[in-house]
Amino acid sequence: MNSSSLLTPSSSPSPHLQSPATFDHDDFLHHIFSSTPWPSSVLDDTPPPTSDCAPVTGFHHHDADSRNQITMIPLSHNHPNDALFNGFSTGSLPFHLPQGSGGQTQTQSQATASATTGGATAQPQTKPKVRARRGQATDPHSIAERLRRERIAERMKSLQELVPNGNKTDKASMLDEIIDYVKFLQLQVKVLSMSRLGGAASASSQISEDAGGSHENTSSSGEAKMTEHQVAKLMEEDMGSAMQYLQGKGLCLMPISLATTISTATCPSRSPFVKDTGVPLSPNLSTTIVANGNGSSLVTVKDAPSVSKP
């Protein structure tokens, strides 16, 4: 029948098969709608099942011809064909995305990243704590502690200046000197206050107890005379050094009138007076008197019979 004409399409006229030069849009559309939508089936050599009654060889030849014609279409010179081909290739994808969706997704991801970065930079960054150098602490507790130590050092320096010959650098030794000096001042204040209140006898006993408790009695006249000269010299040069020396010897300064009252109250039956001083002597007391220009005298009361004169 028509098998020969189908096998040789170039010799027989066919309304559907034309040369590439006379290819029109109707044939192209007919080929598109009659073929499968998958691109892989277009490139496959096996012909798809159709309801056409034409032989397989004829269809295969027709399909090869159509593929050749499709590849020979100049897409750059025919804009309607370009649009149609683009629509075919895009529509044939089963999971295609609309045009511009990739760009929109990329733009959205960039916007999200920029927003995240901007939020991170907007947060205030905590500066690392710089460790202060030694002596320059910035912590309030450390500053208060440093100020407290400075005040203690200043008070210790002022207290050291009040103590005669308080040149100790060790705090413990300096505090020992301060304690001894304060005890000496307490003894002197007690003696002077008792003389003012008229308790000469009690003052004499208090002096004997306090001064003789920690020091040995001076029994030799030579040692007493040396003490007198040393105290007189110190009182002329440095009163503070003299007070410290007296403290070490268990002596204290008191007015001559107080010494006279103490001696009279201790032994009222016998009241011999020391020449040029008017201080009575008692056989039970060892009295050392050193007069100075201020009208005061140095008196020590101890249980010893020796008496010395300036």
Swiss-Prot record:
Region (Basic motif): 136-149
Disruption phenotype: No visible phenotype under normal growth conditions. The triple mutant lrl1, lrl2 and lrl3 exhibit very short root hairs. The double mutant drop1 and drop2 fail to develop sperm cells.
SMART domains referenced in this protein's UniProt entry, alphabetically: HLH
Superkingdom per UniProt: Eukaryota
Job description of the protein: Transcription factor that regulates the development of root hairs. Transcription factor that regulates the development of sperm cells.
GO molecular function: DNA binding; DNA-binding transcription factor activity; protein dimerization activity
Tissue and organ expression note: Expressed constitutively in roots, leaves, stems, and flowers.
Name listed for the protein in its UniProt record: Transcription factor LRL2
Record's keyword terms, sorted: DNA-binding, Nucleus, Transcription, Transcription regulation
GO terms for biological process, alphabetical: microgametogenesis; pollen sperm cell differentiation; regulation of DNA-templated transcription; root hair cell development; root hair cell differentiation; root hair elongation
InterPro entries: bHLH_dom (IPR011598), HLH_DNA-bd_sf (IPR036638), IND-like (IPR045843)
Residue ranges, compositional bias (Low complexity): 1-20, 104-126
Region (Disordered): 1-23, 95-143, 203-225
Gene3D superfamilies (UniProt xref): Helix-loop-helix DNA-binding domain
Domain bHLH, first and last residues per copy: 136-185
Subunit structure as annotated in this protein's UniProt entry: Homodimer.
Major location (coarse): nucleus
Helix-loop-helix motif: region residues: 150-185
Induction behaviour: Repressed by heat treatment.
Localization terms from the record: Nucleus
A GO CC annotation given for this chain: nucleus
Organism this protein belongs to: Arabidopsis thaliana
PROSITE patterns referenced in this protein's UniProt entry, alphabetically: BHLH
Gene that this polypeptide is encoded by: LRL2
